């Protein structure tokens, strides 16, 4: 029964693994709900800022903020949002594949790139492919804080405002639902005029700006872009927990299937050993 003992050891090992993956699935499910709440809570804030800034822009059509101006620089910036940890399926792989495709497209046009990495997985990938990483933010935990993001991303925002780069792209995993997440590489800067259109309402707002409208719109647009980055990080975290929950559930189910197969093999092995012993006993009795 040496084989049977070995199989029992494998069953015990897989059962222990199943307990771990089940616990991780439950933890991810709990974190996913909190991450979704944060993601949804951030949307009204950025939308309200966008609408106020758009109203300001319409009231002051002669002023164009640097974030809405195009330039001819031969360098583009990337903000790449990934996770700090693994065990979340192919989520990071998919977004990094999309980033790679965009990098190659720009390089074929003679445009160099600079990158800000948010998350360990993206930072490691960008370093491996030899990308120019100008700043990074890692170890954000389960709750992203804007003050930890502002410093790293400000490097690219300032570079764009100064005309050193011709655009900023934001790459992250967009949360669709628990079972579906989508890799996105979208242009963050320059802000499109379509995006900055104010909502049509039944009544207009007559704002009083202090110290002046230009100062207010300068500050608002920076806050708006920062809120878009925060929203992307929040969406990425919701996607991470959803992907991890699904991956751990699949691992738990697979472990259950393996345990079932091992038990079947064990029972067959045990049955064969018992049959052999009975045959030997019968043969011995017949010989007597």
Curated annotation (Swiss-Prot):
It is a peripheral membrane protein. SUPFAM superfamilies: ATP synthase (F1-ATPase), gamma subunit. Gene3D superfamilies: 3.40.1380.10, ATP synthase, gamma subunit, helix hairpin domain (1.10.287.80). One of its GO terms (biological process) is proton motive force-driven plasma membrane ATP synthesis. Keywords: ATP synthesis, Cell inner membrane, Cell membrane, CF(1), Hydrogen ion transport, Ion transport, Membrane, Transport. GO terms for cellular component: plasma membrane; proton-transporting ATP synthase complex. InterPro entries: ATP_synth_F1_ATPase_gsu, ATP_synth_F1_gsu, ATP_synth_F1_gsu_CS. It is found in: Cell inner membrane. Its main location: membrane. Belongs to the ATPase gamma chain family. F-type ATPases have 2 components, CF(1) - the catalytic core - and CF(0) - the membrane proton channel. CF(1) has five subunits: alpha(3), beta(3), gamma(1), delta(1), epsilon(1). CF(0) has three main subunits: a, b and c. This is ATP synthase gamma chain. The gene is atpG.
């Amino acid at each position: 029964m040496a084989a049977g003992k070995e199989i029992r050891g494998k069953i015990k090992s897989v059962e222990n693994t199943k307990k771990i993956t089940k616990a991780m699935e439950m933890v991810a499910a709990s974190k996913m709900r909190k991450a979704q709440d944060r993601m949804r809570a951030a949307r009204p804030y950025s939308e309200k800022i966008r609408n106020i800034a758009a109203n300001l822009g319409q009231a002051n059509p002669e002023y164009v903020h640097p974030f809405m101006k195009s330039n001819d620089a031969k360098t583009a910036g990337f903000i790449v949002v990934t996770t700090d940890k693994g065990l979340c399926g192919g989520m990071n792989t998919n977004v990094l594949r999309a980033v790679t495709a965009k990098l190659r497209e720009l390089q074929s046009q003679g445009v160099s790139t600079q990158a800000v990495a948010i998350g360990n997985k993206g930072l490691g990938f960008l370093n491996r492919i030899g990308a120019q990483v100008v700043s990074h933010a890692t170890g954000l935990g389960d709750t992203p804080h804007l003050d930890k993001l502002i410093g790293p991303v400000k490097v690219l925002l300032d570079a764009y405002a100064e005309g050193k780069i011709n655009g900023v792209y934001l790459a992250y995993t967009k949360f669709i639902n628990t079972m579906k997440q989508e890799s996105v590489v979208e242009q963050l800067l320059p802000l499109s005029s379509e995006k900055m259109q104010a909502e049509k309402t039944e009544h207009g707002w007559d704002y009083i700006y202090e110290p002046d409208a230009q100062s207010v719109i300068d500050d608002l647009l920076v806050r708006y872009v920062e809120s878009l980055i925060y929203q992307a990080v929040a969406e990425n975290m919701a996607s991470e927990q959803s992907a991890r929950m699904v991956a751990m559930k699949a691992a738990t189910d697979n472990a259950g299937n393996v345990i079932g197969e091992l038990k079947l093999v064990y029972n067959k092995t045990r049955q064969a050993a018992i049959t052999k012993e009975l045959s030997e006993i019968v043969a011995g009795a017949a010989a007597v």
